[in-house]
């Protein structure tokens, strides 16, 4: 994980630069594809995914080394052919894992976050899951295991394959001619993120679109059918942690409420979006219809609130980068504690931007707990001796958070008086 952390220190800034370029380009072209809080939500989601991976959260059900040990028939020598074969196997596995996520209720929960934005831009590519806590994806790499692809090769290619999917999350690139026949392009992926009936569950491939063409899931982007982005049941929140478990919580509620025992057992494995008839009738949920005007989620925010949200995002981003750069200095408990602090910080500031009634109290409590974390003798001694920069930064950040919350609270009270 230490190597992966160092790789991210280079990759993430590169992604952020590309996002800034896309924002500037959209501004000058008069075709802006970004909104303020949607972008912060996407970037925050990316941070939670990085933390989940770095902290090793999850349970591996079946690993690739296990499959390789028991299934390998061939033994490919190290060569360009080996790496090309391995990359094709990784892409093939990605297609079928992606298809499973789209088709089955339970697995959709861990993929919904990626489709949750009602925009389509490079930032939304960073909406990656933290709810994929069961490690079963290696099962789709059985062809690679049979061919004897070494685990080290898969370890190298897996992040390369993931990072290679970033560039095509954009509305600024049209169709790419002959490339459309064998590579996934922005046009094809716009289709994938759309909720238009003709586009639903189409274009599931990651790099090579031949899988979609062979297995019947390919759909070309049509001029007469502009893509509408998001999910059919809007998430209605900026909080990436809530989004990650929203669909799962809905299934838990349905399983509890339905009076039919077979439904309690099997609704998890039914097609995505399935709900028991008795529950669906008694507890209907909002679902988008393209026959009616669509109002995107965008709660009203004052300039002060936007400034406050951006301040928090900058500070949390700094904390994450400092954590990645000094990952080797942390013991496992300290890494979990600091990572947990970042998780809670993201949960808090995005909840306040949603306007939840409890969010102000939560944020105030988080800020005081953050101060306590850095002033507690055991922790303060560790940070002062090993990581003094983050120690002083933490004290300033959480102190300013408390002051900022008081100012926001005063603004809220003034607005209430004016409205009254």
What does each model-identified segment do?
Residues 2-6, 56-75, 138-154, 315-334, ...:
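Juxtamembrane "helix exit" motif at the C-terminal ends of alpha-helical transmembrane segments
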Residues 44-56, 79-240:
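Membrane-embedded catalytic scaffold of the fatty acid hydroxylase/desaturase
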């Amino acid at each position: 994980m230490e190597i992966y952390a160092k790789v991210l220190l280079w990759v993430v800034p590169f992604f952020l630069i590309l996002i800034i370029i896309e924002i500037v380009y959209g501004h000058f072209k008069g075709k802006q594809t970004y909104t303020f809080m949607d972008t912060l939500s996407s970037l925050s989601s990316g941070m939670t995914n990085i933390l989940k991976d770095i902290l090793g959260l999850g349970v591996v059900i079946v690993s690739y080394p296990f499959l390789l040990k028991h299934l390998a028939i061939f033994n490919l020598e190290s060569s360009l052919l080996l790496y090309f074969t391995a990359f094709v196997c990784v892409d093939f596995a990605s297609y079928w894992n992606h298809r499973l996520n789209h088709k089955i209720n339970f697995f959709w929960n861990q993929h919904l976050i990626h489709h949750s934005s009602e925009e389509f831009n490079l930032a939304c590519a960073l909406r990656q899951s933290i709810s994929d806590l069961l490690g079963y994806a290696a099962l789709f790499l059985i062809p690679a295991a049979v061919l004897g692809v070494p685990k080290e090769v898969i370890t190298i290619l897996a992040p390369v394959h993931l990072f290679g999917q970033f560039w095509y999350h954009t509305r600024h690139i049209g169709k790419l001619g002959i490339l459309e026949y064998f590579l996934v392009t922005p046009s094809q992926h716009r289709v994938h993120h759309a909720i238009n009936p003709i586009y639903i569950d189409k274009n599931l491939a990651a790099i090579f679109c031949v899988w979609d063409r062979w297995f019947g899931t390919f759909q070309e982007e049509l001029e007469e059918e502009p893509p509408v982005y998001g999910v059919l049941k809007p998430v209605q929140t900026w909080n990436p942690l809530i989004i990650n478990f929203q669909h799962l919580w809905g299934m838990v509620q349905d399983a509890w409420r339905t009076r039919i025992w077979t439904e309690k057992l099997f609704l998890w494995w039914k097609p995505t979006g399935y709900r028991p008839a008795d529950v669906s009738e008694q507890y209907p949920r909002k679902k988008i219809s393209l026959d009616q005007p669509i109002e995107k989620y965008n709660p009203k925010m004052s300039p002060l609130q936007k400034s406050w949200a951006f301040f928090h995002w900058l500070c949390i981003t700094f904390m994450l980068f400092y954590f990645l750069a000094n990952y080797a200095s942390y013991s496992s408990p300290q890494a979990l504690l600091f990572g947990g602090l970042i998780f809670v910080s993201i949960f808090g500031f995005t909840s306040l931007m949603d306007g939840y009634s409890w969010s102000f109290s939560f944020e105030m409590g988080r800020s005081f707990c953050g101060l306590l974390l850095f002033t507690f003798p055991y922790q303060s001694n560790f940070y002062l001796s090993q990581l003094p920069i983050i120690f002083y930064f933490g004290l300033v950040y959480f102190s300013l958070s408390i002051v900022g919350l008081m100012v926001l609270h005063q603004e809220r009270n003034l607005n209430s008086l004016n409205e009254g």
